[in-house]
Amino acid sequence: MKKNIKKIALAYSGGLDTSIMIPWLKEHYEHAEVIAVICDLGQQEDLDAIKNKALKSGASKAYVVDVKNEFAIQYLWPLVKSGALYEDQYILGTISRPLIAQKLVEIALTEQVNAVAHGATGKGNDQVRFEYSLKALAPQLEIIAPWRAWDIKSRQEAIVYAKAHGIEVPVTPKAPYSRDHNIWYISHEGGVLEDPSQEMPDDVLLMTSPVSQAPDEEEMIILDFKKGVPVALNEQKLSPVALLNSLNQKAGQHGIGVADIVENRLVGMKIRGIYEAPAAAVLYKAHKLLESLCLTRSTLHLKQSLQQTYANLVYEGRWFSQTKQALDAFIDVTQQHVTGRVKLKLFKGNIIPAGMHSPYSLHHPALATFEEDNVYNQKDAEGFINLFSLSAKIYSQVHQGGNYD
């Protein structure tokens, strides 16, 4: 216990983990003032109720910060441009953690607190993501991680503690799903989901229709991109938040964007998670199609080789790093001409290409045609093939006892 800590800023969500933080912090840091910081990431919760809950739990102040637009522009759009997927599957919804940490620091400095606290467990990735960002942004602040300090060892014990302190939580011992929700995705973990051999229960999905219940008619959508960033849906220019919300609704009802995966956590263990990300799935598909039209072969291949590096960086929470800045600089150059329109059909969990166009398209029918043309001289290929395959020919001659004649 640090006796000199008199004021603490807490990253507060109102869920189980952070619901019990306020009384615990006040108990273990005598006379400490707790300030709750709530970020509106589009989680579609009653944030006023969460604010009141924080105050009723003993917080002296509670801030609600609307970061949805900032989240989309400064975090999600760079992610779309990168095309990064962690382990080729995970859509990286926890990219929100550095932004939460940033807002926590801003309020902490304004309020002149001694310490900041978060509700991430000692078994998960979020503790690393939060604390990496906090140390990068405000290394002078003390960091408190109650899950690594208290005697509570399970979610069931946390529920008991909450009830003992009169704190209402949206979780019961029989259905202890741990959910994280923002405008990019919803994640589901815990309970029966911890066993990968068990099929996902029907009560898990919140934003996406089961494929069996999806419409029997396909839906055509049109996405416009400018320099790798989505700017319009169905020929209507929308704000980033409105575009994401609309696309989540459209793609979600068609059963698109559900991932049931086992991922490797940064802290060493494997975890099963169910992720819903309808808009993200569609945007990634459309962006990838447009890149195939607009990027040169060598640029596309180099970018693809760096996507896992970028995904790892985001997954590990290294958003405020020199590496991330360098990768963003490269990606921004690749996106200068990723501008155009992509048409897609949404149908029972499938995203089907239905045409694309770009003023910067590098695809020229006159060159690619299988019909007779006067542009491409096929005889030119012979010299290229001879030079391209020369090393293979020499290797074969040397190791098979051949000669150079």
UniProtKB/Swiss-Prot annotation:
Binding annotation for L-aspartate: 121, 125-126
GO biological process: argininosuccinate metabolic process; L-arginine biosynthetic process; urea cycle
Residue numbers binding L-citrulline: 90, 125, 129, 178, 187, 263, 275
Binding residues for ATP: 11-19, 119
InterPro entries xref list: Arginosuc_syn_C, Arginosuc_syn_N, Arginosuc_synth, Arginosuc_synth_CS, Arginosuc_synth_type_1_subfam, AS_cat/multimer_dom_body, Rossmann-like_a/b/a_fold
Coiled coil segments of this chain: none
Family named by the database record: Belongs to the argininosuccinate synthase family. Type 1 subfamily.
Protein name from the UniProt record: Argininosuccinate synthase
